[in-house]
UniProtKB/Swiss-Prot annotation:
Family classification: Belongs to the FAM50 family.
Gene from which this protein is expressed: XCT
Coiled coil: 12-43, 70-116
Keywords: Biological rhythms, Coiled coil, Nucleus
Region (Disordered): 89-171
Primary role: Involved in light regulation of the circadian clock and photomorphogenesis.
UniProt entry tagged with the keyword Nucleus: yes
Principal location class: nucleus
Superkingdom classification of source: Eukaryota
UniProt name for this protein: Protein XAP5 CIRCADIAN TIMEKEEPER
Segments of skewed composition (Basic and acidic residues): 89-98, 160-171
Origin species: Oryza sativa subsp. indica (Rice)
Amino acid sequence: MSGFGDGYVGTAQDAVKIRRLEKQREAERRKIEELKNKSSDGQPGLLQFGSSTSEILETAFKKETVGLVTREQYVEKRVNIRTKIEEEEKEKLQKLQQEEEELQMQKRKKRRVRGDPRLSFCDEIENGSDEDEFENQEPQKKHGPVKLGKDPTVETSFLPDREREAEEQAERERLKKQWSREQELIKNEPLTITYSYWDGTGHRRVIQVRKGDSIGEFLRAVQQQLAPEFREVRTTSVENLLYVKEDLIIPHQHSFYELIINKARGKSGPLFHFDVHEDVRTIADATKEKDESHAGKVVERHWYEKNKHIFPASRWEIYDPTKKWERYTIHGD
């Protein structure tokens, strides 16, 4: 063993070490192939996810939003669903980046293994030289500034982000405008109302207005419809006509749209149904609340003042949007 000739192959221990290194290289090669396969399988899925974000957003929003909702609820649900989907996309991207970093680390290890010498005692020589270099470089590192990198796995969605906040604000404004357009379409929809002109007896009629019309506008149309037949309606003003729905006197400034969107409740039935129907469920099950809708009454104010102590006028009271009626009644106060 006087030199390092090309024909020298080492001792039996060296041969064992060489075989062990070859096995390690083979095992690492298999791991790298597995990481490559995982990376290639994950990428198309991410692209596919990103391409269908708008479809997923619309589907999730339709499931969350049923019937009429207020503007604030509409905007809040839309933004919450969009934020949730964006966070899921970000998590998928971070996971893919982490797998890519692990793959690059395995490649660096593989290059270092390929550079190892075949002779065992060369390890000691190189290790010694590495230690000397490390000792020489260590004082220099202490004097230089320490640079810290970013950890891609850390959650940062809670941190302030001007660009993201600007995008969210723009999305809110867009949704508000969209909501306003949709509500205008609803207000212009026709609404058929069954009512009864009440002068002690009922005279039932049907009239059509818009959902956005106020009670005052509705009573003006009623006056025009009843004027040819009833002299007292023809000679009075719209301000002296009252609209009584489910034993509540609805003030002129309220609109049908307001009653519908808030699903307002009266003393004897819902205020957002303007047809007439009976609830057949109560025949089979008396424990269920009736959902019957009764024809609203149009009354001349002078008649009401003269008969408000007599049933049914004795049950009537002014509608208050803040007052909640927990159950429907047709008798008593």
